[in-house]
């Protein structure tokens, strides 16, 4: 058995968003009337309530807006923009799912997704000169890690899906990664800084009973933490200032 993988906590954390999303067969009661019973069960943690922009769902959020729940007629999602520990996010997801299951009673979730989005900003970490092959594992960089490749990189994006080697072949890993230009609201693209986007999405392709949800999410989290550590080389790891366990 492989050792348990834990996320390294960084002072300059690159993780910008974590989302757990559950799909289920359409529930027509959700768009037909406001989910008052569900709100009653999650209001202590998510007191702010608003419809989604398309008016087809609802958003329940903390007052600081750093964590929120999105409910539509066929999806339930918990999103966190200040991730620090898996146990804390896992507990939040469990509480929301329990509230949803109590009110709506789904027999199964048709798709279960755990997604981590990370944005690496070497200049913000004080790294100069910028040499990506000294920061990101060459296996992740692909051809951009080849020696002798010169020029100012303008952009790169790669998208692939792999079947994970267990769970009966029903689990998938989607990786979206590449180079981006990071700009602040007042900046133009020309004055932005180079960044590297790493989006890890783990999901099921077969229905999952609610009682199997927690162990599957735990497994997805382990896969995500392991892959993240494989991608980050020592120089980048140090520059992001790892915190003591």
Regions picked out by a protein language model, each given a short descriptive name:
Residues 1-73, 77-79, 206, 212-215, ...:
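N-terminal low-complexity, intrinsically disordered segments
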Residues 41, 45, 92-103, 220-223, ...:
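Conserved short hydrophobic interaction patches
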Residues 50-59, 102-120, 148-157, 226-245:
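Short glycine-rich, low-complexity/disordered patches
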Residues 65-76, 182-202:
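Amphipathic N-proximal alpha-helical interface segments
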Residues 69-121:
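Aromatic- and glycine-enriched beta-alpha-beta binding-site module
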Residues 197-245:
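C-terminal structured interaction module
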Residues 1, 59, 111-189:
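Aromatic/basic-lined ligand-recognition segments
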Residues 22-26, 82, 118-120, 164-166, ...:
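Beta-strand elements of well-folded, non-transmembrane domains
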């Amino acid at each position: 058995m492989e050792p348990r993988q834990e996320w390294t906590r960084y002072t300059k954390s690159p993780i910008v968003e974590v989302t757990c999303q559950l799909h289920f067969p359409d529930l027509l009661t959700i768009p037909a009337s406001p989910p008052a019973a569900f709100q009653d069960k999650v209001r202590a943690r998510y007191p702010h309530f608003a419809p989604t922009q398309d008016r087809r769902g609802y958003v329940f959020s903390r007052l600081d807006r750093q964590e929120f729940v999105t409910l539509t007629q066929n999806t339930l999602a918990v999103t966190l923009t200040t991730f620090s520990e898996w146990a804390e996010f896992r507990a939040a997801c469990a509480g929301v799912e329990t509230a949803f299951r109590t009110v709506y009673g789904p027999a199964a979730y048709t798709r279960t997704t755990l997604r981590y989005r990370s944005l690496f900003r070497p200049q913000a970490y004080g790294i100069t000169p910028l040499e990506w092959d000294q920061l990101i594992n060459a296996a992740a960089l692909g051809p951009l890690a080849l020696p002798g490749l010169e020029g100012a990189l303008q952009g790169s994006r790669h998208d692939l899906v792999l079947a994970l080697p267990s769970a009966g072949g029903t689990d998938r890993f989607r990786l979206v990664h590449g180079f981006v230009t990071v700009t602040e609201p007042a900046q133009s693209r020309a004055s932005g800084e180079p960044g590297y986007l790493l989006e890890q999405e783990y999901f099921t392709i077969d229905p999952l009973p609610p009682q199997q949800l927690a162990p599957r999410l735990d497994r997805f989290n382990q896969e995500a933490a392991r892959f993240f550590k494989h991608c980050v080389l020592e120089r980048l790891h140090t520059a992001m200032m790892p915190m003591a366990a």
